[in-house]
Amino acid sequence: MAPATEADNNFDTHEWKSEFASTRSGRNSPNIFAKVRRKLLLTPPVRNARSPRLTEEELDALTGDLPYATNYTYAYSKIYDPSLPDHWEVPNLGGTTSGSLSEQEHWSAASLSRQLLYILRFPVYLVLHVITYILEAFYHVIKITSFTIWDYLLYLVKLAKTRYYAYQDHRRRTALIRNRQEPFSTKAARSIRRFFEILVYVVLTPYRMLTRSNNGVEQYQYRSIKDQLENERASRMTTRSQTLERSRKFDGLSKSPARRAAPAFVKTSTITRITAKVFSSSPFGEGTSENITPTVVTTRTVKQRSVTPRFRQTRATREAITRALDTPELEIDTPLSTYGLRSRGLSHLNTPEPTFDIGHAAATSTPLFPQETYNYQYEEATGNKIKTAFTWLGYLILFPFFAARHVWYTFYDYGKSAYMKLTNYQQAPMETIHVRDINEPAPSSSDVHDAVGVSWRIRIADFLSSFVATIVEAHQVVFAMFKGGIVETVSYFGGLFAGLTDKKSSKFSWCQILGLLLALLFAIFLLGFLTSDNTAIRVKEITKDKNASKKSEGSLPAVPIWISAANHVKHYTWMVKEFVVDIAFDTYNYGKSTIGRLGTTPRYAWDLIASGCGAVGNGLKSVLSSSFRFIDFCAGKLFYYGSDGFLSANKSIGTFFNGCYETLYNGCTAIVGHTKSFIYNASNAVYNFFSTIFAGLLNFSTSSQNSILSLLKSFGTGITNIFYNFIYAPIAGVFNFAGDNYMYFFNEVAAVFGKVYNSVVSVLKTVINWILFLIAYPFSLCTRAWIRISQYAPEDVVQVIPIPQAITPTPDVERIVEEPLRKVTDVEDEELVIIPAPAPKPIPVPAPTPAPVIIHQTNVVETVDKDAIIKEVTEKLRAELSAQFQQELSAKFEQNYNTIIEQLKMENTNIQYDKNHLEAIIRQMIYEYDTDKTGKVDYALESSGGAVVSTRCSETYKSYTRLEKFWDIPIYYFHYSPRVVIQRNSKSLFPGECWCFKESRGYIAVELSHFIDVSSISYEHIGSEVAPEGNRSSAPKGVLVWAYKQIDDLNSRVLIGDYTYDLDGPPLQFFLAKHKPDFPVKFVELEVTSNYGAPFTCLYRLRVHGKVVQV
């Protein structure tokens, strides 16, 4: 091979950079058939053929002198640059030398569908297992309870039947004796005794049933699925062991039948298993002169091999261990000699007994050696009924604890298993064990004999038997090979499509399918090649040729000699072909692993092989050229002194050989070149073919997933529509109907209760009046009697008191001095203070005391009080003067007030606002905004007593945008009711918090909180600043406001006014009452007649203002 140049060692100038990287790193870059070797969710995915094309900047960044080394790059790939040579990817050296390139992993495009499927199905499987375990735990309790109750009922029925039959028998027996009657005391005692006896039986029956068989709750002990699988596996292994024991005979060993028992745990002497492989490399089988070295087998038990942790030992598992005879943790049969009963006095004899290993196949038994270990004996177990009863009681009390324990271990088991799958945890391999093949012949008895003490007859028999065994073994190997191939193929298919829990199948990818297709194509090609010449046809043709070539005596052959020779050549050619096929077949069997690796060789590796062949051809060329030159030189020297004829002949021969060499070299070079081109084109064609298949499968998978998703989406939409139309809509309609008409029902109920209340009050009033009359009537009688008695009292003379005269003069009104009105200069205080004038006081005039005047001469003397008369006259005069004064003062005040207001309006234009004044104005505006933006009472507000009583024929507009959910489960669509129009949810209005009705005409009737005299109505809509895109076309335009005595009395309604809401005005607009009704208003209706163009109309906030009227 030609030496490598300096350019080949330079990465930048190397022609095939992938070859350079793989040569320097020791690792080949993978191709599209490489398996995924990265851990799920731990490393980022790599770029693949469907990744977006890299830009020039990215290419420069990936292939330039980076300060760090990247793990992979697709910069030098034919996917992005078809002019580059055929290679896949190149690791970036990051500006370092090639010597620092360490061995690293490369990842090819991988499908994560398998891992995604496992992640999606794992929570479902986990939940199903947990539910199954909980149901199984409850099932055990229910099963115990149901069977116990059923047995208890059957026992009661049986007890009743027994008692009834005894009673009938007793009655029949006593009826035979005439005139014999038992005393009453005997009958009563018997009845009492039977009653208590039945009562005791009924109470103690459950206890007797539970303790009858002396079985505790261990018979219902919960076992996981893994325990069940272990038991099934142990059972299968035991069956194999027993079958092998019955089918094999061992000379000199005990043939006692196996026996099953429940022995006690005793320490004694027993044996250790020793196995040996009986396969021999000798073509004549195992010779007697060769010594077999036994191999001591130490295997882990099923419980120790398990990846996931086992449940804690219970009494049932300990009893199972106690019952084991051959393996302490498995329940299998053992011959009688291992019992303590037979080995009690014979332990020194070391009698070997056959025992079999529990593995994937049965092991061959060889002479055994004693070892100190555990053995078992029979022992009858006695139970304790009281302990059993307490065990049951504790189990029933602590059942939640047991259930929680099962649930915990279930989560722990499957959680650890999932963690191992996600992290690609590889468990430790099992210990090696020498096992015997299923078709392997059993060892003969001569294997254990000494070669010196065997006669020559036995040796010949052994030789013949071993020779026959070798032939049989050869056939068995061939058939086992075919069987193994079939089993591996089936296992491979099963791992691809059914091995959902196998760790190897968790790395499933489309690359395996492509590899499988390649293997199938190769198998079809091989099958066609092997079956090209049918054996029967070939034999028939050979027989025909032989018959045709026969000739009779004294006659010429029927077939010419050259045809017969051609047939023989054909026959021997076929034999050579069959020999070559056999060689290839054997090569495949013994080089299966090498061929398997070649099956996944990258495409560029074949180029490397071709280039290697070219390099070998170059070397061969140089070697042959040197050899011929050496021969030519030697021949020239040898025959130099020969004759010219010999020299010329030598030259001719040299020229001939040189020409042959040149011809051969040129032919080989052409063959190598054509072979290389053919392999390259064939690999490209195969690659393109499988790439097309892969793309088709990928597109089919994507379209299938999309179809399934669309089907599920359609199914979900249909379910949602069914739920809405048939479940939610009727329920919502009922609730809406109830919400819209609850006031009607409430009024009816209130009227009924009002009538009942009035009736009760009237009855109570009548009763109370009667009670008061009955109480007051005796007192009235006593009072009348007392008055009648007082008429007969003596008469007394009453002295007349003289009335003094008083003169009240007229008050001097002119003396009241009117103070000039002050000029108001303070703008913020516009109220005028009215100073009331003092009322005139009367001036008392002393008068002499006149003599009493006798008015009427009767039994009672009456007098006139002058002070009372003066006081009455004074009060009348004062009232008249006050009214006149108030009238004149009001006229004066109104005149001065108008004058001051005009002056203030003129002065306001020149007012300068200072800081305090502005602060006062701002506070006034904040106060007005805080009082519902109006500073007036809203009698339609729901929180103060207002209510929406009707919407007439208005149909609510539903947007189906507010979906209510419960635990992320959609329940129903929420929409605002008409009540939101008179509610104050916040100080500001937000888009959507309104009641919308269809089209542009609608009604809303409101019951006010009080009877009022309506002065104005205000309506507020959202501003254009908060509306989306400033669109407020759903605002009302023309409105009518009506007043009702009763909401259903259309004849009494009065139009307060018709108004237009100006969309260009402020959001809150006031409308003064144009017509005031002549009755106190309790019901107000807003009728919208038009809007600003939307297919629906929205109402945000309605207010009604006025003054309360006492009714």
UniProtKB/Swiss-Prot annotation:
Induction: Induced by DNA-damage. GO terms for molecular function: lamin binding; protein-membrane adaptor activity. GO terms for cellular component: cytoplasm; cytoskeleton; meiotic nuclear membrane microtubule tethering complex; membrane; nuclear envelope; nuclear inner membrane. GO terms for biological process: egg-laying behavior; locomotion; nervous system development; nuclear migration; nuclear migration along microtubule; post-embryonic development; regulation of cell migration; vulval development. Residues 1-509 are nuclear. Its main location: nucleus. Residues 912-1111 are annotated as: Interaction with zyg-12. It is found in: Nucleus inner membrane; Cytoplasm, Cytoskeleton. It is a single-pass type II membrane protein. Residues 243-252 have a biased composition (Basic and acidic residues). InterPro entries: SUN1-5 (IPR045119), SUN_dom (IPR012919). Residues 118-244, 503-507 are annotated as: Required for nuclear envelope localization. Residues 945-1109 form the SUN domain. The chain crosses the membrane at residues 510-530. Residues 531-1111 are perinuclear space. Expressed in all somatic cells. Not expressed in germ cells in the mitotic and transition zones of the gonad. One study shows expression at the beginning of the late pachytene stage in the proximal gonad, but there is no expression in the male germline, suggesting expression is specific to oogenesis in hermaphrodites. Keywords: Cytoplasm, Cytoskeleton, Developmental protein, Membrane, Nucleus, Signal-anchor, Transmembrane, Transmembrane helix. Involved in nuclear migration and anchoring in hypodermal precursor cells. Most likely recruits anc-1 to the nuclear envelope where anc-1 functions to tether the nucleus to the actin cytoskeleton. Component of the unc-83-unc-84 LINC (LInker of Nucleoskeleton and Cytoskeleton) complex where it recruits and interacts with unc-83 to form a bridge connecting the nuclear envelope to the cytoskeleton which allows for nuclear transport along microtubules. Its role in nuclear migration may be in association with lamin, lmn-1. The SUN domain probably plays a role in the nuclear anchoring and/or migration. Required for the localization of unc-83 and anc-1 at the nuclear membrane. This is Nuclear migration and anchoring protein unc-84. It comes from Caenorhabditis elegans. The gene is unc-84.
